[in-house]
A protein has these predicted regions:
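Active-site segments that bind and position negatively charged phosphate/pyrophosphate groups
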Residues: 1-86
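C-terminal charged capping/lid subdomain of soluble metabolic enzymes
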Residues: 61, 68, 72-144
Length: 144
C-alpha cells in the first residue's frame, strides 16, 4: 500500500510532469474485459508501449536497461534500450504474467473501440509523446 501511495502522490515525479499513458490504455482493457486484472493488463501493455516510444527517449530507456535489467554497456544506447524492454517482458513472463493481449483472450476486433475510449473527447492521449487513435491501435497491435 505504501508503494501504491507513493506512486500516485506526485512524490516520484520530483516536480516533473507525470503521465499515466499506459494506465489509461489499460483502464480501457480492464474496463471492457472485467476478467482482466489491472496488473495483468499493465504487464501486457507496458512493453508494447515501450517498444513504440523508446526511440524518442533512448537515453532514459537505456539507463533503465543498464541499471535495472543489467544490460551490457557494450551495446549502443538504442540496442540497450530495446534489450531492456525485451528483458522486462521476459521477466513478466517468468513470473507468470501475460505478455500478449491474446493471452487475455483479446483480439484486434476490440482495438479501435479501446483506443476511442482511451481518448475520450480528445484527439490525442498525452504522454512522453502524444498518441492519436491510430498510434494507440498500433500499440495494441504490438501487444497482440
Amino acid at each position: 500500500m505504501l508503494a501504491s501511495s507513493f506512486s500516485h502522490n506526485g512524490l516520484t515525479g520530483l516536480g516533473g510532469k507525470l503521465y499515466f499513458t499506459v494506465h489509461r490504455l489499460e483502464h480501457e482493457v480492464s474496463g471492457m474485459f472485467d476478467r482482466v486484472a489491472h496488473g495483468a493488463g499493465l504487464a501486457v501493455l507496458f512493453p508494447a508501449w515501450a517498444k513504440y516510444v523508446y526511440r524518442h527517449f533512448t537515453a532514459r530507456f537505456a539507463r533503465f536497461a543498464y541499471q535495472v535489467m543489467d544490460v551490457s554497456k557494450s551495446l549502443t544506447e538504442e540496442e540497450a534500450a530495446y534489450e531492456g524492454i525485451i528483458r522486462l517482458e521476459a521477466y513478466f513472463r517468468q513470473i507468470g504474467m501475460p505478455v500478449r493481449l491474446s493471452e487475455l483472450d483479446i483480439d484486434e476486433t476490440s482495438f479501435e473501440k479501446m483506443a476511442e475510449k482511451a481518448l475520450g473527447q480528445n484527439d490525442t492521449l498525452n504522454g512522453i509523446i502524444p498518441l492519436n487513435k491510430n498510434q494507440i491501435i498500433e500499440i495494441f497491435e504490438i501487444a497482440k
